[in-house]
Regions:
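Divalent metal-coordination and catalytic microenvironments
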Residues: 28, 38, 50, 64, ...
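Active-site neighborhood of phospho(di)ester-bond hydrolases with catalytic His/Asp-centered motifs
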Residues: 36-39, 58-68, 81-85, 146-149, ...
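Active-site HxH/HxHxD metal-binding segment of metal-dependent hydrolases
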Residues: 43-135, 173, 224-237
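Active-site-adjacent loop/tail segments of enzyme domains
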Residues: 180-197
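Conserved beta-strand hairpin/beta-sheet module of binuclear metal-dependent hydrolase folds
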Residues: 3-52, 157-172
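Surface-exposed cleft-lining segments at the edges of enzyme active sites
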Residues: 143, 172-182
């Protein structure tokens, strides 16, 4: 694995950062602060890379507690780190170096043994983030929107300056993983997407937690259509196996979900 970061500058102080293991983080800069959205799997120094892009004081906001989104938090002990308290259990269990190394082993095999020294250590304490919390970065704000489903503590963030939505894993171009043991019932995810749509936010584009990025705002509608189709007929999906377990995969109108047919309704 090549331990390096890359970025795309989308203008207006928004940077998409690709980690060595390909997950996506985002840096959003105001006039007084910068917000780092997610810290990735914690391989290599994301902090050093971010400091090449901005010298503003940082805050870190995790879209949820999975290891490929909060695994690098240990580098940022000198700034506030926000994560929903509803994801603290999975953060504590899944963001240890040992758990993350095991995840990466599924990707690159025994090569992970050669890069163990590159894994960030430490699980710093986090501050809770609630629905509607506003992060003032100076002449721009990010507003937290809770979207429980993929995990109990998933959030999106709406940027009032560019009208982009930072979607984490809730709104990716690929499969939304709803088959995990700690994922909530599919109907909960559907309710989150319907609520998000009903907010009538003037979303221009969505920046997801995995490539490709960005995706179009109609991905919300596509995920809603897919979830409704599954709820109507839980057997429509085809079996899929991943490194994290197995589920059924359904795709409707370009929106796809990987789900557990036994976790459909509340």
């Amino acid at each position: 694995m090549d331990i390096k970061f890359l970025h795309l500058d989308f203008g207006d102080g928004v940077y998409a950062i690709s980690a060595p293991s390909t997950e996506q983080m985002y840096l959003v800069c105001g006039t007084k602060k910068a917000a780092l959205i997610d810290t990735g799997m914690g391989i290599g120094s994301l902090k050093d890379y971010v400091r090449k892009l901005t010298d503003l004081p940082l805050i870190v906001i995790n879209t949820h507690g999975h290891p490929d989104h909060a695994g690098g938090n240990g580098e940022f002990t000198d700034c506030p780190i926000y994560l929903s308290d509803k994801d603290l259990d999975i953060y504590a269990k899944m963001c240890t170096p040992e758990f993350r190394q095991n995840d990466v082993r599924f990707m690159i095999g025994d090569e992970v043994d050669q890069i163990k020294s590159e894994f960030v250590t430490g699980l710093p304490k986090t501050l809770n983030v609630n629905d509607g919390d506003v992060f003032d970065l100076g002449e721009r704000t990010l507003t937290a929107i809770t979207v429980p489903g993929h995990t109990a503590g998933c959030i999106c963030l709406f940027d009032d300056q560019t009208h982009c939505l930072l979607g984490g894993d809730s709104l990716t171009n690929g499969d939304t993983w709803m088959f995990l043991d700690h994922s909530l019932p599919l109907i909960t995810y559907l309710k989150s997407m319907v609520r998000l749509l009903g907010m009538n936010l003037p979303i221009t584009r969505i920046f997801p937690g995995h490539l490709p990025t960005p995706v179009q705002p109609d991905m919300i509608l596509r995920k809603i259509a897919c979830a409704k189709a599954i709820l109507n007929d839980p057997k429509i999906g085809l079996p899929v196996r991943t490194f994290a377990g197995s589920g059924l995969r359904a795709e409707v109108n370009g929106g796809s979900i990987l789900y557990d047919p036994l976790k459909i309704n509340e």
